[in-house]
Amino acid sequence: MTNVITRFAPSPTGFLHIGSARTALFNYLFARHHNGKFLLRIEDTDKERSTNEAVEAIFSGLKWLGLDWDGEVIFQSKRNDLYKETALKLLQAGKAYYCFTSQEEIEKQRQKALENKQYFIFNSDWRDKDPAAYPTDIKPVIRLKTPREGSITIRDTLQGDVVIENSHIDDMVLLRSDGTATYMLAVVVDDHDMGITHIIRGDDHLTNAARQIAIYQACGYAVPSMTHIPLIHGADGAKLSKRHGALGVAAYKDMGYLPESVCNYLLRLGWSHGDDEIISMDQAIKWFNLDSLGKSPAKLDFANMNSLNAHYLRLLDNDSATSKTVERLRQNYNVSKQEVIYINQAIRSLLVRSETLLDLVQLAQIYLVDSPIIYKQDAKEIIENCDKDLIKQVIENLNKLKQFDKESVQNKFKEIATHNGLKLNELMKPVRALITGMTASPSVFEIAEILGKENILKRLKII
C-alpha cells in the first residue's frame, strides 16, 4: 500500500479526550506503518464553542504522547472560501439548491411527524422551484439535492457494508445563510483537498458517513477507505463518562502515567497482536494493521493501566527517573542538590514499589531532609502508642555506631531487638514510622545508609 494519508480531526471545544487520543494513535500508527503521512486538522467551525485553550490542549496532548503530525496544521476556520466555492459549484451543477424555509417551519414539520409517529425527513418546497420565485428579502441556505431513489453503501473495513436508503437521508445544509459552511461539507472538502486515503474514527461517526458519502458523490470525489472503531467503555460496560475516571490526556499525565504506557494501553484497547501486552511504539508501527481491530467496545481498566505503567517506570534509567521525580517534587518543595543525590541513590528501590509517578514522588519525600516530614495517620498512631524509652535506646545505640552502612545498621537493630525480647519487625514498626512517616516503605536500613547518621537521629529524636 502506497501514499497512505490519514488524519486526526478534533474539535477544539474541551480537553483532548482519551478516546480521541486513541483515534489519533490508530491513525498515526497506520500512516507510519505504511510510510505515509499523518495530518492534523482542527475542526473549529463552531466559533462559539471553540477555544484557543482547547487547541493548545490538543497540541500538547499529542506531543506528550509522541504523536507527531506531518506538515502544517489545517484550521477549518481559515478555509471557508474553499467550502463556499464548492457549494456554489454544486449549485451550478444542479446538485444543490437555495432553500428559504425558516427553522420555525422546519420545527413545525418535525413536531407534526412526531405527533403522527412518523420518521422525520425534511422535504423542502424549494428543491425544484424556479429561481424566479425566490424571495429577495430572505437569505437562503444551500442544501444538497440528495437523490430520492436508491441507497448509499458505507464500505467499512471493520463493520462491513452498511446500506442506508437515500429516502432516510435529508437534503442537508451545506452553506448556512451567513455564508459559513456546515461541518458535513467542510469535512468532505478537507478530506479531498488534503488527499486523505483512509478515515479511521469512532463508530459514533458511522451515522454521518452516509451523509458525507452523498456529498463525496455529488462533488465527484473518490470516497476514502473508512474504518469506524467501537468507542471505549467503562469497566462496567457503560459508555465512558466522567464517573469512570479521568477523561483528558492531561489528567493522565497529572496522575503520574508515562506517555509510553498510555500509548501502549490505548493500543490494546481495541487492537491486539496475539497475546502481546507490552508493545513499544516501534513494535506498534511495525505490527499495526486494521485487520486486528476488535468489533466490540473496549473497557477502560485502571488496574491494567497501572500494571503497564509500573513496567514502563522500571524501564527508566536512574537519572531519568530521578529527573521526573524531582521535577514533580519541585512543584511543592525546594529540593536541594544533596536531596537529589539521595533520591538518585534510592531510585531503584522506589521504582519497584511504584505504579505511577505520584507513587514515586510520595516515596521520594522520605529523602527530603530539609523539609518537615509528613506523617500518615496510621504512622502517627504507631508513634503515639510506641515505647518511648525503646526509641531512646535506639538513638543511643545508633549514635555509638562508627560505621553507618546498611549491614552495620541492620545488625545493630537485631541486637537491640534481641536485647529487648522483640522480633525485629516489632522494633522496626515505630522506627519506620518515625523515619519515613509511613508504615510501608523501602528498607529502613537502606534509607539509613543513604541519609546518614545525623539525619536519621534527627528524625528519631522528634519523639
Swiss-Prot record:
Highest taxon of source: Bacteria
Gene3D superfamilies in the record: 1.10.10.350, HUPs
Localization per Swiss-Prot or TrEMBL: Cytoplasm
GO biological process: glutamyl-tRNA aminoacylation
Residue interval(s) of motif 'HIGH' region: 10-20
InterPro entries, alphabetized: aa-tRNA-synth_I_cd-bd, aa-tRNA-synth_I_codon-bd_sub2, aa_tRNA-synth_I_cd-bd_sf, Glu-tRNA-ligase_bac/mito, Glu/Gln-tRNA-synth, Glu/Gln-tRNA-synth_Ib_cat-dom, GluQ/Sye, GluRS_core
Binding site for ATP: K242
Catalytic activity: tRNA(Glu) + L-glutamate + ATP = L-glutamyl-tRNA(Glu) + AMP + diphosphate
EC number: 6.1.1.17
Record has Aminoacyl-tRNA synthetase as a keyword: yes
Annotated keywords: Aminoacyl-tRNA synthetase, ATP-binding, Cytoplasm, Ligase, Nucleotide-binding, Protein biosynthesis
GO molecular function: ATP binding; glutamate-tRNA ligase activity; tRNA binding; zinc ion binding
GO annotations of cellular component type: cytosol
Subunit structure: Monomer.
Family: Belongs to the class-I aminoacyl-tRNA synthetase family. Glutamate--tRNA ligase type 1 subfamily.
Protein's UniProt name: Glutamate--tRNA ligase 1
Organism phylogeny: Bacteria, Pseudomonadati, Pseudomonadota, Alphaproteobacteria, Rickettsiales
